[in-house]
Swiss-Prot record:
Designated name of the protein: Undecaprenyl-diphosphatase
The protein's role, per its UniProt record: Catalyzes the dephosphorylation of undecaprenyl diphosphate (UPP). Confers resistance to bacitracin.
Bilayer topology: Multi-pass membrane protein
One of the record's GO molecular function terms: undecaprenyl-diphosphatase activity
InterPro entries associated with the record: UppP (IPR003824)
Keyword terms, alphabetized: Antibiotic resistance, Cell inner membrane, Cell membrane, Cell shape, Cell wall biogenesis/degradation, Hydrolase, Membrane, Peptidoglycan synthesis, Transmembrane, Transmembrane helix
GO CC annotations on file: plasma membrane
UniProt family annotation: Belongs to the UppP family.
The keyword DNA repair appears for this protein: no
Predominant localisation class: membrane
Subcellular location: Cell inner membrane
Catalyses which reaction(s): di-trans,octa-cis-undecaprenyl diphosphate + H2O = di-trans,octa-cis-undecaprenyl phosphate + phosphate + H(+)
Note: Bacitracin is thought to be involved in the inhibition of peptidoglycan synthesis by sequestering undecaprenyl diphosphate, thereby reducing the pool of lipid carrier available.
């Protein structure tokens, strides 16, 4: 058993879990961490997507009571049916656009300028969204996910598609997009987490199926360690974030994104990291 490889898998799992649900782009951080660890071949790229499943188990655990009650009520209660429909409607745009344009995006948009621009522009959008809600609280019209309409969900789903641009952040696009669409910070964050469940499970399953020829049973320990550490770090991160947003905004994450965008350019120009698929 390659202990060094398992340590790398654990580190990558921690990076995935800590960054997947914060509005800072897990993809950008995994690329940087993988380059620094020498863990960036084709198999590692499949690994990066597959270990998102560990983070999803963390979401399911944190929100289990809501998920369980929704599943039980689904056959009879309209509110549960509406909630499930909203998650499904929000999920569909990413599936369609991912299948249509996924290869083209990987071929043309994984460049230092695109990744850095996504980080920096995303940071300024977060600053704007937070300033907008703080200056005009009347823009908040939805305070919980149960109050969302199907059209609200579709709009958030369309915004999620922006995360196909590397460096954008799936959670960042859905949370900040939701806030700009009138959701409270808490409602936008909750819906982003619920939407992550089908989105990331689908992405992980598709990646494993598509690149199954690269994998063997010998890789099971590496994937198992990555999934475990992804789950544990994501669970801690989600619990922390839900407490954080109760009394804080996303402004610190905006400045972090801007700084990280500069790091992307610096590492690319110095040759430390190859920001390409």
């Amino acid at each position: 058993m390659d202990i060094a490889l398992l340590i790398k898998a654990a580190i990558m799992g921690i990076v995935e879990g800590l960054t997947e649900f914060l509005p800072i782009s897990s993809t950008g951080h995994l690329i940087l961490a993988g380059a620094l660890l020498g863990f960036d071949d084709d198999k590692a790229k499949v690994f990066d997507i597959a270990i998102q499943t560990g983070a999803i188990f963390a979401v399911i655990l944190v929100y289990w009571q809501k998920i369980r009650s929704t599943l039980i009520a689904l056959p009879n209660e309209k509110q549960a049916q509406q909630f499930a429909l909203n998650v499904l409607v929000a999920f569909v745009p990413a599936v369609v656009l991912g299948l249509l344009f996924g290869k083209a995006i990987k071929a043309h948009l994984f460049t230092p300028v695109v990744v850095a621009s996504a980080f920096i522009v995303g940071g300024f959008i977060i600053l704007w969204a937070e300033k907008r809600q703080q200056r005009n609280p009347a823009t908040i019209r939805i305070h919980d996910v149960e109050s969302m309409s199907t059209m609200d969900a579709l709009k958030v789903g369309l915004v999620q598609c922006l995360a196909m641009i590397p460096g954008t952040s799936r959670s960042g696009s859905t949370i900040i997009g939701g806030m700009l669409l009138g959701l409270s910070r808490k409602a936008a964050t909750d819906f982003s987490f619920y939407l992550a469940i089908p989105t990331l499970i689908g992405a992980g399953a598709y990646s494993l199926f598509k690149d199954r020829a690269l994998l063997s049973m010998a890789d099971a320990p590496m994937f198992g360690v990555g999934l475990l550490f992804s789950f544990l770090s994501a669970w801690l991160c989600i619990r922390w974030l839900l407490r954080y947003i109760a009394s804080h905004d996303f402004v610190p994450f905006a400045w972090y994104r801007i700084a990280f965008g500069i790091v992307v350019l610096a590492t690319a120009w110095s040759g430390v990291v190859t920001w390409a698929e």
